[in-house]
């Protein structure tokens, strides 16, 4: 079992229960899922770019990504409905906890010119979204085998009712928020 999951159960739950005066431990916010999304608009011209993005996301998440397709045709972008334009992975359970641990301890500190994550990236319902400009911050990606530096979106979905609760939950995991 992931160390972060044990830490959540043993310490974070009690900490948040006293802070927000919850009646039951089931009211304490928890992380439901983590979604990784990589948009590859250039895949329209070169199909190999999408395959490389899928390989990168597989290495980062440990799970095979779902290829996302365009929902509708947009003439300005020269895409048609059904064209593959990206890939995404939804992590739950043990893989989610292991990824979160790697993200906090290894990947985020490797971001270039890192001064902390913005606390303004909450959506109003306690979910947190962040963008990563380079996939090479993850140790699973071999820098020499990267054909192109790609970014990805990371969304952490929680059961928190407000941004304050969501931020308290992530701060309890030592998320490096900007002061």
From Swiss-Prot:
Entries under Gene3D superfamilies matching the protein: 3.30.1440.10
One GO-annotated biological process of the protein: translation
Transferase in keyword set: no
InterPro entries on file: Ribosomal_uL5, Ribosomal_uL5_bac-type, Ribosomal_uL5_C, Ribosomal_uL5_CS, Ribosomal_uL5_dom_sf, Ribosomal_uL5_N
GO cellular component, one term: ribosome
The organism's place on the tree of life at top rank: Bacteria
UniProt KW ATP-binding keyword: no
Record keywords, A-Z: Ribonucleoprotein, Ribosomal protein, RNA-binding, rRNA-binding, tRNA-binding
Signal peptide: none
GO terms, molecular function: rRNA binding; structural constituent of ribosome; tRNA binding
Sections of the chain in a coiled coil: none
A Pfam family matched in the record: Ribosomal_L5
Subunit composition and interactions: Part of the 50S ribosomal subunit; part of the 5S rRNA/L5/L18/L25 subcomplex. Contacts the 5S rRNA and the P site tRNA. Forms a bridge to the 30S subunit in the 70S ribosome.
UniProt function note: This is one of the proteins that bind and probably mediate the attachment of the 5S RNA into the large ribosomal subunit, where it forms part of the central protuberance. In the 70S ribosome it contacts protein S13 of the 30S subunit (bridge B1b), connecting the 2 subunits; this bridge is implicated in subunit movement. Contacts the P site tRNA; the 5S rRNA and some of its associated proteins might help stabilize positioning of ribosome-bound tRNAs.
Protein family per UniProt: Belongs to the universal ribosomal protein uL5 family.
Name used for this protein in its record: Large ribosomal subunit protein uL5
Designated gene of the protein: rplE
């Amino acid at each position: 079992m992931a160390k972060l999951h044990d830490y959540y159960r043993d310490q974070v739950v009690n900490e948040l229960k006293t802070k927000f005066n919850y009646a039951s431990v089931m009211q304490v916010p928890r992380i439901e899922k983590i979604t990784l999304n990589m948009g590859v608009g250039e895949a329209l011209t070169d199909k190999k770019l999408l395959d490389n993005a899928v390989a990168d996301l597989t290495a980062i998440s440990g799970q095979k990504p779902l290829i996302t397709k365009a929902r509708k045709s947009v003439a300005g972008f020269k895409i048609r409905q059904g064209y593959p334009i990206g890939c995404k992975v939804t992590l739950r359970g043990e893989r989610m906890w292991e990824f979160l641990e790697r993200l906090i301890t290894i990947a985020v500190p490797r971001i270039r010119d890192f001064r902390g994550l913005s606390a303004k990236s909450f959506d109003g319902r306690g979910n947190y979204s962040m963008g990563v400009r380079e996939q090479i911050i993850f140790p699973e990606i071999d820098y020499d085998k990267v054909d192109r530096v790609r970014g990805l979106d990371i969304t952490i979905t929680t059961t928190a009712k407000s941004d304050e609760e969501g931020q308290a939950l992530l701060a309890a995991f030592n998320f490096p928020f900007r002061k």
